[in-house]
Amino acid sequence: MRYLYIIFILFHLAVASYGQSFYAVNPNPKYEVRAVWLTTIGGIDWPHSYAQSERSAEKQKEELRAILDRLQKANINTVLLQTRIRATTIYPSQYEPWDGCLSGFPGKSPGYDALQFAIDECHKRGMEVHAWVVTIPVGKWNSYGCRQLRKRFPRLIKRIDQDGYMDPEATQTGCYLAEMCREIVQRYDVDGIHLDYIRYPETWKFRISKDQARGNITRIVEKIHQAVKKEKPWVKMSCSPIGKFDDLSRYWSHGWNAYTKVAQDAQAWLKDGLMDELFPMMYFRGDQFFPFAIDWKEHSYGKIIAPGLGIYFLDPKEGKWNISDITSELYHLRNIGEGHAFFRNKFLLDNHQGVYDFVTAHFNRYPALVPPMTWESNKRPQQPVTLCIEENEGTTTLRWDNSLQYEDGTAIKTPSIYNNVYASKEYPVDVHDARNLILTRTTRRQLTTRTGNTPTYYAVTTTDGFGNESRAKQLNQTAVVKTATRYGKACRLTTTGESIILPSSIHETDCQYIIVKNMQEQAVYITKPQNRKINIKKIKDGIYTLNCVNYRNIEHTLGTFIKKGAQKK
């Protein structure tokens, strides 16, 4: 604790110089959460138009694509997408109705699944997407979502002034929210469940002790955690607690904190494994920010902390902050090993006081990977089994195939396997240097770039759903080849249904690996040739190509074959 307070004091001495001396300590971290809250309530971040026809739905989609393109340019790697709004959703739920932000009419479909669309678009850009679930508030008392929920569970909703809230003291609240989160995780390839307002309303009249109140909120978190992790243990559990956990020995929270005021025992959730990640809402300055950020780090228990920054205060309509308030906070967070999250998307992309330019051109100039959840799994995937390069006029195409196993030989069970691509003018490529990252978290198996005048060296790694990264498969520039034609045109191969015999033109010493690919050019089976016979018994029925990778990492297509059932009409 004393050491971090010394850092805090020294940091303030450095703020006068815009934080540059501290920034030089680790200017380009390879692992860092860089997040943004993308708010859908009222369309305040997105969407700004309604989907009431096929054409208007496409306009809505194009707006989100444009937003994500700009976030990608700023090297944002995590999008917190508001999914459950106020007892309403942006996806077809069996529990709650559509929110009106998409179609303009509460309860009416916009004609497409906005959550699925957002997931697809985020993943195309190498970004994680977390379903942001607003938990306790359910909107105005007479709003559509609140009315529908009150009809089904009249005793579950409490009224405070004009607003409705799920009762945090009712056992059914945790069960209901857990089922909603289970529905999302079962149906969608989300990377996280992000709980918002998982606390008592600050105006709640407590009739129980604060310890009992904290126990009630923790039981809700436990139920949601169990539901999510039972379905997919690689899905991150996170929440956005009040930005100051509690009063510190030297700094007062001014009565606004998570632990005492609203019964959020968020640091215990990290310790007990109920949360993988926290996004504390630290919309403060000075001694209401810096020491409390250190406190979150000191009580992170090896988990991920990415404080939320109140960049909306840069807008003169919202506050009177200066850009230096935000930049000094960013420098501080990086130096103590925390990530950052911007509240919210509009204020980042509107570039108030140049904040977007600062992040894009300077602070987040290079990509970063989301830290792995080693507390859930620390198995290391096998490195890509093949990596080859092909040069055509003016372009260079890098191709690779993944193993579907960990280094210990067990199968990778996460549904998606990702790759990171590195490039450098030096060999071997230093994959610990974020400046060499050119493509992150991609599900593609090839990359085409313009051919430069100087030699470029490449390396590719594999990551699983937990974020564990393999050793690098390095490719020396001497491996560059033209389109391989050694074995002539690909031919039709015959099969017994359980095995294939390699063509007579192929010698075992020519092949390092045999790869079976489907018609989408995805590797479905990788093996080493033995006795010229390739066992395909475990491959599903279908049409495939058989490919050979030689010891120079050059891949050739040997031919095509049909696995038995695909031949039936």
Where do the model's predicted regions map?
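Aromatic-lined carbohydrate-recognition surfaces of secreted/lumenal glycan-active proteins
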Residues: 128-140, 194, 213-259, 304-308, ...
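Substrate-binding cleft of secreted/luminal carbohydrate-active enzymes
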Residues: 266-267, 271-289, 303-376
